[in-house]
Amino acid sequence: MKIRPVILCGGSGTRLWPNQKNYQAKQFINFGNWTLLGKTLERIKKKIFDAPIISTNYKYLKEIKKHLRKHKIKKYKIVLEPAKMNTGPAILASSLIKDIPYSQPLLFLSADHLMERQNIFYKEIKRYQKYLSDKNIFIFGIKPTMPSSEFGYFLTKKKKKIDQVIKFIEKPSKSIAKSLIAKKGYWNSGMFFIRKNSIINNFKKHQLTTYKYCQKAVLKSKHIKNIYYLDKNEFIKSTPKSFDHAVLEKTKEINAIKLNIPWSDLGSWQEICKMFDKNKKNLIKKKNIFYRPWGRYINLFSGKNFLIKELYVKPNGILSLQKHFHRSEHWLITQGLPKITLNKKKFTKKINESVFVQKGTIHRIENPNKKPVKIIEAQLGSILKETDIVRYQDIYGRVK
């Protein structure tokens, strides 16, 4: 039997756009002729997959249809959530729609993940499909590349040929993350591999109320062509919990599929800056290089309400002490040891460390060293022009 991919596409992207009204959900951000949702849709075009199901909300329907047309996916089903109830009800409702066989393997994917070496991903899916049962759940783990507090972790023990999950740790501190990596812990990617009957059995056992009302929401849904409009009155009676809290924390039959591949959920501007730093050779154009007394900057990519730059600060180069009215900035240090000023605070940052400059914050970058400093900068705001600079001090005489 083929595997049915279910793409969870209801996230709002507020982690990237805090306190901003006019933001774009992460899965739809155009990073230069590609989006994260587009990458996900391309990922499920293999012959091992059946037509996808997309779980989303009314707000994103138009954008999702646009993506489906662009990526030439003609067979699909869309399940529209009438209210935001977290991933537990979303996963269950998507599983309960008709035409899905009771024992159908379902692969739950986030719409906003980047993944390389996908052949390994496909190989592991096919390898573990035979172990799916009407009770167990397989989660995908990513081998950590660093001790991050941005992800949940899990630990496993070997049981026959399968890695059984014995403990979950939700977004630990960096020191605890280091100890988890030493114990061969993996990042919890948020992707699941499970049969339909296992989802039903687990929700009946651990979240009976949610099961009852999601089932009613599906039965009473309006089914127009390939879109299911879930019944709001029933759906909102389900318990608004994530799938992790609703089921994973309660069931004992959880197994792991461990992946050692480049992966990111681009959940922060630091991760986005890393992505652009990795691919900057393909983005640099002479017309986008601008020279300043302190060094130079290169505009790598301009998106909706954001701009990605690389700053090159020469030895002893000092940017002006300045602030912006219309933008905030995220800096990722990729080379050197810059001295940073944020209002009255002064500190030094190392490679791979980041700095957030809130709109209106007086700030400065200095390079007191003999080697150059390189920083990937993400500017976020309604106005991203060089005119949005108020200078207080400048060794090059640019204060007006």
Question: Which role fits each region the language model picked out?
Answer:
Residues V313, L342-H363:
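Short acidic-glycine-tyrosine-enriched beta hairpin
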Residues H326-K344:
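Glycine- and acidic-residue-biased ligand/ion/polar-headgroup-sensing regions
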Residues S320-Q322, I340-T341, V357, H363-N369, ...:
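Short beta-strand His + acidic residue motifs that chelate non-heme Fe in jelly-roll/DSBH
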Residues I73-K159, I200-H206:
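Conserved beta-loop-beta/alpha segment of the NTase-like Rossmann-fold superfamily
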Residues P144, Y153-K287:
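Catalytic core of tubulin tyrosine ligase-like
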Residues M1-I7, R15-N22, N30, W34-F108, ...:
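Conserved N-terminal catalytic core of the sugar/cofactor nucleotidyltransferase
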Residues R364-K400:
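Double-stranded beta-helix
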Residues K287-S328:
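A short glycine-rich, His/Asp/Glu-containing loop-to-beta-strand
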